[in-house]
């Protein structure tokens, strides 16, 4: 009996340690960490920029080949999910999180939903906090010069974007059902401190 009690206690301690380890590594509660501030993660790069880890963030500040934006595209596809992201943008940044892309070899707002980070977009209604050509923002919130958060939920046709605690998008749209996600670098300075996704 005593031996069984010791065994049971050992199993409980082991389970608790495993749970703590899972949470610490960002995999707890179903969340998968794609960027954690210490390593770039496993991406396919489409277009070239000087992506690098610096001071606890994934940073890009220059296109290194051609003129087109650069994208880090996830290896996995996602249908219904939540995303949590922490990022810093300068005033000139043109970036975004592209979701449910129809393919991974070419990324743009026509084949993905583009959750925008672009304070100086000529048409600000689809600037920072909007989904380009799907859901406008008015007034457009600003991301430049500070750390920001995105919480993005895609469940069926229902898309919700929360920027720095403020809901900027709550829309129904069914053009794109599933696919990889991508982080964009277009211009300015972009830093990604954390990106996590939780399949629903």
Identify the function of each model-found stretch.
Residues 1-11, 17-18:
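Bacterial N-terminal signal peptides that target proteins for export
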């Amino acid at each position: 009996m005593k031996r069984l009690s010791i065994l049971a206690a050992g199993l409980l301690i082991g389970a608790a340690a495993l749970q703590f380890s899972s949470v610490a590594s960002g995999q707890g509660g179903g969340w998968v960490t794609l960027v954690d501030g210490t390593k770039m993660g496993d991406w396919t790069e489409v277009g070239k920029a000087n992506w690098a880890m610096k001071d606890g963030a994934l940073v890009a500040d220059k296109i290194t080949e051609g003129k087109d934006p650069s994208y880090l595209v996830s290896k996995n596809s996602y249908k219904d999910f939540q995303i949590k992201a922490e990022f810093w943008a300068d005033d000139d940044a043109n970036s975004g999180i592209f979701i449910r892309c129809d393919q991974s070899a070419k990324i743009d707002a026509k084949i993905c939903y583009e959750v925008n980070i672009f304070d100086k977009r000529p048409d600000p209604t689809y600037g920072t906090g909007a989904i380009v050509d799907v859901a406008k923002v008015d007034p457009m919130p600003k991301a430049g010069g500070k750390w920001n958060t995105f919480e993005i939920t895609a469940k069926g046709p229902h898309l919700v974007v929360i920027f720095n605690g403020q809901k900027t998008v709550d829309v129904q749209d069914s053009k794109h059902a599933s696919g990889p996600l991508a982080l964009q670098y277009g211009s300015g300075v972009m830093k990604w401190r954390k990106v996590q996704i939780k399949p629903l």
